[in-house]
């Protein structure tokens, strides 16, 4: 792959070829499109022509004709969705005629060919190449089968089958085959398959361009048709709204007037009947109430009378009984005084017994109360004792708990201290033994790896030198041929890169054109839908406002008309009521007068008939009477028949009127039904249909928005996932790199800290060892100095005694081999009591000294003032033979310990300041602690001098 890396890349770009349309839709003239049949009208015909047929075509449903082509859409229809060119490519070009192939070849050869197809496809997918080579190769195999050639014996088939077995490698053989099939065909079959592939691609491109132009024209035509349709709908809507307002208002006015009159008449009749019934009911109720109350009053009077009679009889009986009883008692009172005395004695005895019993009861009660209180006190005392015992137990328990808690806490503290000590020891061991040992082990491994790499590089260098010598021995012809091949390959690669760059430019131009076309279609759809919704919303709102205003005005007018009609009807009713009363009075008067006149006429007629009968009676006979009776009977029958005919005529007229009124009522009901209820139902149904249509459109729009949002969310989620994955990957790489750097830096810092601590502890151990050695040296010197001082003290005392005094004055000095002669005699003041204290003080003072320890025998220039005075006194008086002896200096241990620089008589390693140990390399106080340790590690004299 290293040799063919650039070739692989150029071939990959070569296989991803795209085609640019030969002519864009903006460059094609209108006349050419009309002649080719791609459009049916020119721009002038669209502007100046009528819009009726476009509206009809736009309102038709979209129906694809089965006889039309795959990409041919009828003009002025909505654009169909674009067809995936990859699927078309596979369907039109790459499908094998499997029936014919199986007819010519056996199953084994078909399986071999299909296996090779799958291997080629896997190879192209593995190296991220286009599948155009597979399509051309399939066309090539189909052409071979059609020509009667066995594809299994083909040269290129066998080469591909051999090369694609096992692992996929992009070598020069496959590159040459790709070049033959894609760029330079060597036989007519390959050229024919390549031509078929290019023809299919060009066909797809032409169909796409044709579909694009047709879609644009259909879009413009639909937009124009929609505008015209909106104008027509607006005009029709205005006409329909005017007519509906006109006819509905007239019908409503007539129906309202008729309904109001009918309601008034019916309500008046109901009111009259209601008033009459209420009057009758009130009259009957009053009568019933009066009858009931009258009966109650009568019953009460009878009851009181009965009670009065009964009470008078009872009172009389009781009075008689009481008077008789009183008389009887008075009569017996005279005879029964002894009985009265006995009764009073018994009463007195009862009183005495009662008092005695009362006193006994009081005593018993007090005794019982005292016993009760005593029991209560005993119970309370027992309860208090129990409580005190419980409290004592609680106290003991609390003390024990507190003690155990403290014991547990101290035990836990000790455990924690032990755990902390063990952890610190473990960390120290891990730091010292793991880190340092591991670092040394890694250094050794690194050294071994460097040595091995150097050996490998040496072998490689030797091999390269041998290879160079071998290539130098080759012929010049091979060298020139390789140079020629390289130059030709380089030129071919540059040409391929140029073609790929041109194809990429064409692809980007085509993609941008398709993107702009798609955006234009989407924006056109959105604008048309927005115009529709805005127009519908605008005029729907205006129509709703007008309908609400009309309804409110109709309600107000109907209310005003009803109020006026009620007032007019009440006025007419009042006038007619007055007239009816007057007419009733007149009618009654006329009836009375008419009755009087009829009575008078009948009386006069009777008188006249009687007079006529008296005049004509003698001349009339029976025959004449019978004839006259017959005539009268005929005349009366005629009159009766005539009256009956008149009554029948009146009855028929009344029946006709009733039938007419019934028919009128039925017609009126039907008219009301068709004018009012049907109109209301139609309006409600129309409103329901409008609302349903609006909701349907709104739902479709919402579904489109939701789908687009879901698609956008999916795209955004994928984009965000990819972006976050790349960010996460880079962040993870940075964290990994930083963690490696941090580990390296921490390892370096830990190594530095451990080295510092090891140096410090090694220096401390060296100091301790040196101090031990100096202490031994000091002890030897101190022993010698002590012996020397004791000898000198014994000599001075012996010389200063009066028994050993001499007359001559000599200079008494004891010379030691350690120090030189001094001008004055030196001694240690004090007595033998301070020897041990002095030795211990000097030991503790010079326990940490770093230089030579001075001798305990000091000169007068080094001793203090008291020692100087004593030495001077001894030198002046004692040695000159004075009779008085100077007192020895008194030793004060408190003063000496106070003047000492240190009171410690041994080396205490606990006084060495502790250095906090931590594994973290960011401790900023390492140098300060080291300085502090160095400062405290000095001797007391050096610290005093500072």
UniProtKB/Swiss-Prot annotation:
GO CC annotation: what is one?
A: cytoplasm
Compositional bias (Basic and acidic residues) = 926-940
Name the principal localization, coarsely classed.
cytoplasm
Indicate where this protein resides in the cell: Cytoplasm, Cytoskeleton, Spindle pole
Chain positions found as Phosphoserine: 10, 855
Q: Name one Pfam family in it.
A: Sfi1
Give me the ranges of the annotated region Disordered: 846-901, 917-946
Keywords of the record: Cell cycle, Cell division, Cytoplasm, Cytoskeleton, Mitosis, Phosphoprotein
Extract one GO BP annotation from the record.
spindle pole body duplication
Q: Where is the composition biased (Polar residues)?
A: 857-883
The family database entries (CDD domains) matched by this protein are listed as: Sfi1p_helix
**Family according to the record:** Belongs to the SFI1 family.
Task: Tell me, in a sentence or two, what this protein's role is.
Answer: Component of the spindle pole body (SPB) half-bridge involved in the initial steps of SPB duplication.
Q: How does it assemble?
A: Forms a complex with CDC31 and interacts with SPC110. Associates with the spindle pole body half bridge.
Name listed for the protein in its UniProt record: Protein SFI1
Source species: Saccharomyces cerevisiae (strain ATCC 204508 / S288c) (Baker's yeast)
């Amino acid at each position: 792959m290293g040799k063919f890396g650039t070739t692989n890349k150029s071939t990959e770009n070569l296989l991803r070829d795209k085609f640019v349309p030969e002519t864009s839709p903006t460059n094609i003239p209108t006349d050419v499109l009309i002649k080719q049949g791609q459009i049916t009208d020119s721009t002038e015909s669209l502007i100046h022509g009528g819009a009726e047929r476009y509206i009809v075509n736009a309102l038709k449903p979209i129906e694809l004709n089965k006889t039309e082509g795959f990409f041919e859409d009828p003009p002025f229809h909505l654009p169909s969705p674009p067809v995936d060119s990859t699927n078309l490519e596979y369907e039109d070009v790459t499908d094998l005629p499997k029936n014919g192939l199986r007819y010519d070849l056996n199953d084994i050869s078909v399986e071999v060919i299909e296996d090779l197809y799958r291997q080629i496809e896997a190879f192209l997918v593995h190296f991220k190449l286009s599948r155009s080579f597979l399509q051309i190769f399939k066309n090539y195999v189909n052409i071979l089968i059609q020509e009667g050639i066995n594809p299994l014996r083909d040269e290129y088939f066998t080469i591909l089958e051999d090369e694609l077995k096992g692992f996929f490698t992009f070598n020069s053989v496959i590159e040459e085959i790709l070049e033959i099939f894609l760029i330079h065909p060597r036989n007519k079959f390959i050229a024919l398959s390549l031509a078929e592939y290019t023809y299919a691609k060009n066909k797809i491109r032409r169909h796409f361009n044709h579909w694009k132009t047709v879609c644009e024209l259909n879009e413009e035509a639909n937009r124009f048709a929609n505008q015209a349709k909106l104008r027509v709908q607006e005009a029709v809507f205005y006409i329909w709204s005017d007519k509906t307002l006109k006819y509905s208002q007239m019908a409503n006015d007539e129906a309202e007037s008729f309904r109001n009159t009918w309601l008034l008449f019916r309500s008046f009749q109901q009111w009259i009947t209601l008033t009459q019934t209420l009057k009758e009911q009130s009259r009957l109720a009053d009568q019933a109430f009066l009858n009931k109350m009258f009966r109650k009053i009568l019953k009460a009077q009878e009851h009181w009378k009965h009670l009065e009679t009964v009470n008078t009889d009872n009172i009389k009986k009781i009075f008689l009984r009481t008077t008789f009883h009183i008389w009887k008692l008075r009569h017996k009172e005279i005879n029964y005084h002894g009985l009265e005395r006995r009764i009073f004695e018994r009463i007195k005895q009862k009183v005495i017994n009662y008092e005695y019993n009362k006193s006994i009861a009081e005593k018993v009660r007090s005794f019982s109360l005292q016993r009760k209180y005593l029991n209560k006190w005993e119970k309370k005392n027992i309860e208090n004792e129990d409580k005190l015992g419980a409290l004592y137990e609680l106290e003991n328990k609390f003390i024990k708990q507190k003690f155990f808690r403290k014991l547990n806490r101290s035990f836990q503290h000790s455990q924690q201290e032990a755990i902390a000590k063990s952890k610190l020891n473990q960390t120290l061991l891990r730091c010292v033994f793991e880190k340092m040992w591991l670092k040394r082990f890694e250094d050794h491994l690194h050294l071994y790896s460097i040595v091995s790499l150097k050996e490998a590089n040496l072998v490689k260098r030797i091999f390269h030198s041998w290879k160079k010598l071998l290539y130098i021995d080759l012929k010049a012809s091979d060298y020139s041929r390789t140079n020629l091949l390289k130059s030709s390959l380089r030129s071919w690669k540059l040409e391929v890169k140029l073609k790929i760059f041109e194809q990429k430019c064409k692809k980007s131009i085509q993609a941008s054109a398709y993107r702009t076309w798609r955006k234009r279609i989407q924006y056109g759809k959105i604008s048309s839908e927005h115009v529709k919704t805005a127009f519908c919303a605008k005029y729907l709102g205006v129509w709703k406002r007008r309908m609400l205003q009309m309804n409110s005005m109709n309600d107000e007018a109907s209310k005003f008309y009803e109020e006026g009609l009620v007032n007019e009807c009440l006025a007419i009713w009042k006038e007619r009521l007055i007239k009816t009363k007057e007419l009733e009075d007149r009618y009654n008067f006329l009836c009375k007068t008419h009755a009087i006149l009829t009575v008078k006429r009948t009386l006069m007629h009777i008188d006249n008939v009687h007079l006529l009968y008296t005049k004509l009676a003698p001349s009339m006979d029976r025959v004449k009477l019978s004839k006259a009776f017959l005539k009268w009977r005929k005349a009366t029958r005629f009159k009766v028949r005539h009256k009956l005919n008149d009554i029948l005529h009146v009855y028929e007229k009344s029946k006709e009127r009733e039938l007419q009124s019934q028919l009128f009522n039925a017609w009126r009901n039907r008219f009301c039904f068709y004018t009012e209820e049907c109109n209301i139902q139609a309006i409600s149904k129309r409103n329901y249909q409008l609302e349903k249509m609006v909701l349907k459109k709104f739902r479709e729009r919402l579904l489109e928005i939701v789908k687009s949002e879901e698609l956008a969310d999916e795209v955004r989620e994928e984009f965000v996932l990819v972006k976050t994955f790349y960010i996460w990957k880079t962040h993870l790489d940075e964290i990994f790199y930083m963690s490696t750097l941090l580990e390296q830096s921490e390892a370096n810092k830990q190594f530095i800290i451990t080295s510092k601590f090891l140096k410090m502890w090694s220096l401390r151990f060296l100091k301790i060892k040196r101090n031990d050695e100096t202490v031994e040296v000091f002890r030897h010197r101190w022993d010698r100095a002590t012996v020397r001082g004791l000898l000198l003290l014994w000599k001075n005392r012996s010389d200063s005694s009066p028994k050993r005094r001499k007359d001559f004055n000599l200079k008494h000095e004891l010379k030691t081999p350690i120090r030189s002669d001094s001008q004055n005699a030196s001694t240690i003041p004090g007595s033998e009591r301070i020897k041990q204290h002095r030795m211990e003080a000097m030991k503790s003072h010079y326990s940490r000294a770093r230089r030579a320890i001075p001798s305990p025998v000091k000169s007068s220039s080094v001793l203090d003032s008291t020692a100087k005075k004593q030495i001077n006194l001894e030198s002046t008086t004692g040695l000159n033979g004075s009779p008085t002896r100077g007192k020895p200096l008194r030793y004060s241990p408190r003063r000496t310990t106070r003047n000492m620089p240190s009171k410690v008589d041994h080396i205490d390693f606990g006084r060495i300041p502790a250095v906090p140990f931590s594994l973290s390399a960011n401790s900023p106080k390492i140098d300060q602690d080291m300085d502090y340790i160095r400062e405290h590690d000095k001797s007391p004299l050096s610290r005093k001098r500072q």
